[in-house]
Amino acid sequence: ELEAGRKVQQALLPEQNPDIAGWSIWLFTRPANEVGGDLVDYLRLDENKTVLTIADVAGKGLQAALMTSKLQATIRALATEINSLSDIGKKINKIFHRDSLPNLFASMLFIQIDSDSGKINFINAGHFPPLIVNDKEIKELSKGDIAIGLVSNAEYNEQTLVLEQDEIFIAYSDGVCEAKNEYG
């Protein structure tokens, strides 16, 4: 059953990186277990706007995997109705809170890239803060708001930035921080 679950989760991942004019984007995920709560996804809204999601449902195994699939379906259903990222964050949270088990939550970065204006808009729901990297420094952005699903009436603050020519925007999940090799 876990192998079947892994195959379903793999099928839900994007087959390729998004092709956004003027941008170079690399999405990567490698689950630590057969199935789990990691979500990496994107959806093209129109010729200029693409949304990216990086999320991590708390826990491991089948429960986390099922709630991750539910979260992905919710995001995809609501993404085309964007008025503001704050609003979509509130809607995603309300649905996840309503439909999940008590004390189950997810961290999430929901990012909208506008290739026409060069803007990155995002909300951070309890996820690791994104980084801006250039040849001189690494800058950690805001830690964000409460994780998805903890309370039904959460608020999410939309942040906007425009990258300079030499800057890189990095969004990551716990696998980067918790990864260990034979040297620790």
Predicted regions mapped to residue ranges:
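Conserved catalytic-loop aspartate of Hanks-type protein kinases
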Residues: 174
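… and, occasionally, acidic/histidine-rich disordered N-termini of signaling adaptors
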Residues: 1-170
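Short, intrinsically disordered, charge-balanced linker/junction segments flanking boundaries
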Residues: 181-184
